[in-house]
Amino acid sequence: MVMTTAAASSPRTYQVRTYGCQMNVHDSERIAGLLEQAGYLRAGDADDVPDVVVFNTCAVRENADNRLYGNLGQLRPSKDRHPGMQIAVGGCLAQKDRSEIVRRAPWVDVVFGTHNIGSLPVLLERARHNAAAEVEILESLDVFPSTLPTRRESTYAGWVSISVGCNNTCTFCIVPALRGKERDRRPGDVLSEVRALVDEGVLEVTLLGQNVNSYGIEFGDRYAFGKLLRACGDIDGLERVRFTSPHPKDFTDDVIAAMAETPNVCHSLHMPLQSGSDDVLRAMRRSYRSERYLGIIEKVRAAMPDAAITTDIIVGFPGETEADFERTLDVVRSARFSSAFTFQYSKRPGTPAATMADQLPKPVVQERYERLVACVEEITWAENRRLVGETVEVLVAVGEGRKDERTGRLSGRARDGRLVHFDAGSLAGQIRPGDVVHTTVTYAAPHHLNADGEPLAHRRTPAGDAAEAGRRPRTAGVSLGLPTVGAPPSPVPPAASSACAC
């Protein structure tokens, strides 16, 4: 019997629900691109029940399991009322739990992992044809994700993966076990995708990897990441380049120089600290110490005095003492972060930290967490207040300001990554997402800036034109390029339709 595709009958609708890090956000763009290439249509907000719901899951946080199974339970009545509806579960939790998902939620139709996203359309068809769940988990990549089509969510900003997987062995992290060892894309491949996005009107690109500073080791060039940043500087129309996440143990001076000397590379750095205690860092197997971390920040600020530095911090790691925690506060005060993502330690089965002695009581972790948040907010507020009266360039965004409709403001990101809510003034109705505005900061809060005066300048952009027309950038798959920074891209055909930070 010949299997039919979704496009062979009336178009089926889909919805992707994403949990977790930027890797998952970008993977979800590829999932959407695959489904649309196979003939599915994205479900609108007003649609009753999508024909296919895909959960792209995270396995890093402790409540990831509860969140997934709670949402699956909420969908069961809809599935019972609509027998043709399909539910698929992918991502890191699917890679970890595998057939356990179907055992706990037998109404799930497809389970796929982090290494075989491209198989999703075929698995959906097979499950529908056989009226049985399809569970397919691979231990390594079947195709590099860059070969898959992508439906981008933003007209003005895009993610570009430079690598997948991770070679580090942090004791709290399950990501390497779920996404595998690091595999690097060739620079020519990365630059081809960046150029394709810019050709679609995208102004800002974020280079994405579990550890961007180890990029190039696979093909024998430990300075490849700095070269890649400089090569991005040669792409006409690319106004902003960001990257996430670097690892302090691999951070080199050539990257700092590339950031400082390449005009379109933003002076913003997100570099996870995790802990300020050397003893805790050793237990985490982080391979650097607080002195090195602060030394990198000192070099970054010497080269770029306006740099905004953000971080990740874990509180309550097994064995963390009060003295260890105080050392973390000391490093936070010295580093003066412009923002910090703070987390209470979450025990993940399968990680070395999960079986360590001296797991801390929840009340102790909560109390330290609250003190850390208070310390961070005091510093970020002070750092933001220094910008009152300064002119900032804002790339206008969608969905950044939760109160924009009530306040009448628009929102976007400054070049250093800070969130800015601004008054459009006499330009109300003319400024679109993707446009660029220059405005003056009038107020600072711990997590954002306000600019309530008349904008000083407004520049219409191709990204704004695309947003106004309701277009979304769609990029075909990009095949592996040559291991030479700046190598001219070769034409590539579209991919066949059958096809978290350290």
UniProtKB/Swiss-Prot annotation:
Pfam families: Radical_SAM (PF04055), UPF0004 (PF00919). GO terms for cellular component: cytosol. Residues 12-129 form the MTTase N-terminal domain. It catalyses: N(6)-dimethylallyladenosine(37) in tRNA + (sulfur carrier)-SH + AH2 + 2 S-adenosyl-L-methionine = 2-methylsulfanyl-N(6)-dimethylallyladenosine(37) in tRNA + (sulfur carrier)-H + 5'-deoxyadenosine + L-methionine + A + S-adenosyl-L-homocysteine + 2 H(+). InterPro entries: Elp3/MiaA/NifB-like_rSAM, Methylthiotransferase, Methylthiotransferase_CS, Methylthiotransferase_N, Methylthiotransferase_N_sf, MiaB_methiolase, rSAM, rSAM_horseshoe. Its EC number is 2.8.4.3. Keywords: 4Fe-4S, Cytoplasm, Iron, Iron-sulfur, Metal-binding, S-adenosyl-L-methionine, Transferase, tRNA processing. Its cofactor is [4Fe-4S] cluster. Residues 451-502 are annotated as: Disordered. Residues 152-383 form the Radical SAM core domain. Binds 2 [4Fe-4S] clusters. One cluster is coordinated with 3 cysteines and an exchangeable S-adenosyl-L-methionine. [4Fe-4S] cluster 2 binds at residues 166, 170, 173. Its main location: cytoplasm. Residues 385-455 form the TRAM domain. It is found in: Cytoplasm. GO terms for molecular function: 4 iron, 4 sulfur cluster binding; metal ion binding; N6-isopentenyladenosine methylthiotransferase activity. CDD domains: Radical_SAM (cd01335). [4Fe-4S] cluster 1 binds at residues 21, 58, 92. Belongs to the methylthiotransferase family. MiaB subfamily. Monomer. Catalyzes the methylthiolation of N6-(dimethylallyl)adenosine (i(6)A), leading to the formation of 2-methylthio-N6-(dimethylallyl)adenosine (ms(2)i(6)A) at position 37 in tRNAs that read codons beginning with uridine. This is tRNA-2-methylthio-N(6)-dimethylallyladenosine synthase. It comes from Salinispora arenicola (strain CNS-205). The gene is miaB.
